[in-house]
């Protein structure tokens, strides 16, 4: 199952999870030190939604991110779908 947004193209990113030790300088310590670094993935908030398209006069079932859902609220579904098709998502 793909974890990519159909409207914005957001997909999982790679990064690190840091293990930190020490007492912060604010608490009169010598500062926080990174003692370990583990690879991890950051996943977008993808959900399956049924949205009504006025142009096609039917429901569209899309896997979209929370950011795309806010875009749909702001611009309307048909405009966001047209933008996604032009960008190739």
From Swiss-Prot:
Name of a matching Pfam family: Ribosomal_L28
Domain of life: Bacteria
Keywords: Ribonucleoprotein, Ribosomal protein
Biological process annotations from GO: translation
GO MF term (any one): structural constituent of ribosome
Gene Ontology cellular component annotations, sorted alphabetically: ribonucleoprotein complex; ribosome
Keyword Ribonucleoprotein set for record: yes
Ranges in coiled-coil conformation: none
Family label: Belongs to the bacterial ribosomal protein bL28 family.
NCBIfam families: L28
Protein name: Large ribosomal subunit protein bL28
């Amino acid at each position: 199952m793909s974890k990519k947004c159909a409207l914005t193209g957001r997909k999982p990113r790679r990064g690190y999870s840091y293990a930190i030790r020490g007492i912060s300088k604010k608490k009169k310590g010598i500062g926080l030190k990174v003692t370990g670094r583990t690879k991890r993935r950051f996943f977008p908030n993808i959900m399956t939604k049924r949205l009504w398209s006025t142009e096609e006069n039917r429901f569209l079932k899309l896997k979209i991110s929370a950011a795309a859902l806010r875009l749909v609220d702001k611009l309307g579904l048909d405009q966001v779908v047209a933008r996604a098709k032009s960008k190739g998502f």
